[in-house]
Amino acid sequence: MGLWDVDKIEYVGRAKGPKEDFAFHYYDADKVVAGKKMKDWLRFGVAWWHTFNQELVDPFGTGTAHRPYYKYTDPMDQALAKVDYAFELFQKLGVEYFCFHDRDIAPEGDTLRETNANLDKVVDKIEENMKSTGVKLLWNTSSLFTNPRFVSGAATSPFADIYAYAGGQLKKSLEIGKRLGAENYVFWGGREGYENLWNTEMKRETDHIAKFFHMCADYAKEIGFEAQFLIEPKPKEPTLHQYDFDAATAIEFLRNHDLTDVFKLNLEGNHANLAGHTYQHEIRVARESGFLGSLDANQGDKLIGWDMDEFPTDLYETVAVMWEVLQAGSIGPHGGLNFDAKPRRTSFYEEDLFRSHIAGMDAYAAGLLVADKMNQDGFIQNLQAERYSSYDSGIGKDIDEGNVTLADLEAYSLDKPQSELIAATKSDHLESVKATINNYIIDALAEVE
């Protein structure tokens, strides 16, 4: 059985019925969908922080999680033990990627030098396990938000010593990424923002973080670290207002600071909701702007206004996400679906780590199957083509091709009666569109054996 009292998770389809717990009903890793294996479309990753470090605390209570490595009370002993548990979990789930923050994998020392020594010991063991299992690092990142020194930010801190420390910490993190062959490197600015504008020099802070990003890019080039750099937008929490508010804001920041050749975006479902957007909206913005890099797979709760990091189970959302991915051709150049998600506080058994990942993996596999069926039928493409058909000829075509002026538009419209203008509009039949998507979900998944 191994370290975890769970067998390897296998694909069973729908044959054993909906109550089969420890099996995939829709995720068939080697099944070819739209010209690629399912595993190559989805490129699932496990998040070290939520999976192995999360004790399932909440603001009103202590942790409830049962984890086998809690028997190790020394922080370094536990950190090293987690590596063995982690790689067995990856293999039993059939997941080929993982992600971590530097401070997830090893305890901090009193100085950066001591902390780096701790990291080296754990990275040695991670590297050995990567070589023996073939599991790869989707991305790594640096925790520049948990320690109290980052109370007012890291690369936007008003305290130069903290900025300098952040740079030193980031240097080591990039070296680890290079050593472990990370395909991406993520920057999430949890403390990069402000609590109050009265005491904040916003331009100075954003200029500082832009300089920081340029230094990181320069050092990555110096050491030959070729990972795709990614910014992960989030509007707030823990900071009142974060500078990487959403996809559009982050893209504008990159354009303003000459960073568009270096960065793309890592987008998270629950972060999109906090910014007042759907996950599909954020992916669409990034995709159509050429900045789609990778995805963090989770969801929020419609009734709760903070970052819940639930495992994704909403099929309507996973269909929308995978439809966008199909249009893009991939989740970015080297991206994947990292489960930045944790079991609920009441799901505290060891086995719930497996149950929750199975739920998320099946939800996205189902989303891919439905999106592929919609794509094959051209349902969305035909819907959009019909809606914008007035731009295929006449004045519409001239507008699309940039061949008109305001004077031309005035001349075209001056004598058109209201009745003719109203007649030019058409109903969207939105309720039928949504019903048809529901039908695709039901029908496409019914075809799975």
UniProtKB/Swiss-Prot annotation:
Its cofactor is Mg(2+). Homotetramer. Binds 2 magnesium ions per subunit. One of its GO terms (biological process) is D-xylose metabolic process. It is found in: Cytoplasm. Keywords: Carbohydrate metabolism, Cytoplasm, Isomerase, Magnesium, Metal-binding, Xylose metabolism. It catalyses: alpha-D-xylose = alpha-D-xylulofuranose. One of its GO terms (cellular component) is cytoplasm. The gene is xylA. It holds the Pfam family AP_endonuc_2. Mg(2+) 1 binds at residues 232, 268, 296, 340. The keyword Cytoplasm applies. SUPFAM superfamilies: Xylose isomerase-like. It is an enzyme of class 5 (isomerase). Belongs to the xylose isomerase family. InterPro entries: Xyl_isomerase-like_sf (IPR036237), Xyl_isomerase-like_TIM-brl (IPR013022), Xylose_isom_bac (IPR013452), Xylose_isomerase (IPR001998). Its EC number is 5.3.1.5. This is Xylose isomerase.
